[in-house]
Amino acid sequence: MNNIINQLTKMKLGNDLIGELKTLPPYNKNIRKEDKATRLVALSDIYNIYIPSAMSVEIYSKLYLALLHSLQKKSGLNARRQQNENYKIICQRSYNSILGGSDSFTITGHSGLGKSLAINKAIEIITQNGIIETKNPYTRIIPCLVVQCPFDCSVKGLLLEILRKADETLNSDYYDKALRNRVTTDMLIGCVSQIALNHIGLLIVDEIQNVANGKNGKALVGMLTQLINNSGISICVVGTPDSTPFFEQAIQLARRSLGLSYGAMEYNQFFFDFCRTLFEYQYTSEQTEISDGIIQWLYEHSGGIISVVVSLIHDSQEIAILNGSERMNLDTLNEAYKKRLTMLHGYIEPNITHKSQTSVQKQKVKGYTSHAETSIYAENTVASIIAEAKEKQADAVGLLQKIFTVEVIDL
C-alpha cells in the first residue's frame, strides 16, 4: 500500500498550486513593431494563457483525493478476492462484488468555462511522476485515464475505448485481443473491471451529456456503476448541464451525479484581473489601455464565458491588424462580436430585457412638447426613434430609455 501511495505526487495547495496551474506565454512588446504576418502568427499565443480560478483549485483537489481513495483499494485481501470474482465474470459464471463503494462524481458546467482545461491541468500536475510501478507483485498503474462517452452511448464502445486508451499507455494488446475473440459485453465488463483494478487509478469519462439523448443512456450509467463495484476505482464523469435532467430521473442515477457544478463567471475581481492580463498581450501597432467600461462591455458581450472573452480579444486584434486600423478598441470589439460570434448571439444578449405581453402597448414619451402628442410603440426600431428625436430636437438617449433598457458606459 505505502509503496503505491509514496509514488503519487504530493498534494499541492495555496500559492504552490496556483503557480503550477498558471500558464503565461512569453511576451515582448517589441512584437508590435514586426510585420503583420509575424504579429498574426504570434497572436495565437493568447489562446495559451491560463489563469487558475477557484474552479481550477476545486477540480484539482477533487481529482487528487478521488485518485488517492482508489489507490488505497488496490492492495489487501479484498483486492485479491475481487480479482477472482472478475475472472468469474469473464468465464460467465455467477460472481459477487467485493470492493463496491460510491466512488463516482460529476463535474458539470456550460461549454467554454474551461472545465476540460482545468481537468487537463490537474491531471498534468497529478501525473508528474508518470506511471506508478510496484515490484511485489509487479504491476503498472495509470494514475488518470481519460475517455469520451460515445455519441450513441454504446456500452461496448465505451468498454473497448477504455481498453484502447489503456493499451496506448501500457503498450499492451487488450484491445486487439478483445476484437479477435469477439467477446460479449458481459465478458468485456469482467475484462475491463480486472484491468481497471490492476492498472487504472482514476477513470474520467468526458461528454457524459450524451446519455441524456441516447437510448442506451441508462445502460451505460449502469455499466459504470458495475465497473465501480467490480474494480473499486473512482470514476469522474464530465459534461454540460444537459445531463442533469437525466440523472434526476431516479435516486440511483442522482446518487451517481453528486459532485461539482459550475455556471458563468461572476462579474468580480477575478474577471477584472483576467481581462487586464489578456490586455497585456497586444499585437497591434498602437497600444490600448483597458478601462472599466471595456471590462464591463466584455462581460456583457461574453455572458461571463471565459472562452468567449478570449475569442473577442483575439479576433478584435486580428481585425485591427488586417484592416490597418492597428488599434484594439470598442469599434473592433463590436465588429468581432457582430461578425465572428454570430452563432452565439442567441445565447448572449447584452442590454436587452425581454417582457412578455399579449398586445402592443402604447407608451407616451415625456420630456418635450409638440403640436401632436408623440407616441412610440414597442415595435419601433432604434433607427426610427433616433430619427424622430432629431426631427423633434429631443434627447435620443432619453427616448430610447423609455422603450428599451439602455446603459451608458463612460470610457
Give residue ranges: language-model regions.
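Walker A/P-loop-proximal flanking segment of P-loop NTPase domains
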Residues: M1-D103
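C-terminal alpha-helical "lid" subdomain
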Residues: N2-I31, K36, L43-I46, Y50, ...
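Mid-core helix/loop region of P-loop NTP-binding domains shared across ATPases and GTPases
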Residues: Q72, G76-I90, N96-G100, S154-E161, ...
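Walker A/P-loop nucleotide-binding motif
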Residues: Y95-N120
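The feature captures the helix immediately C-terminal to the Walker
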Residues: N120-E124, V310
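Post-Walker A helix-loop "phosphate-sensing" segment adjacent to the P-loop in P-loop NTPases
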Residues: I125-P137, E168-T169
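Conserved catalytic segments around the Walker B and adjacent sensor/switch elements
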Residues: I131-P150
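The catalytic "switch" region of P-loop NTPases
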Residues: V192-L197, L202, A212-N213, G222-G293
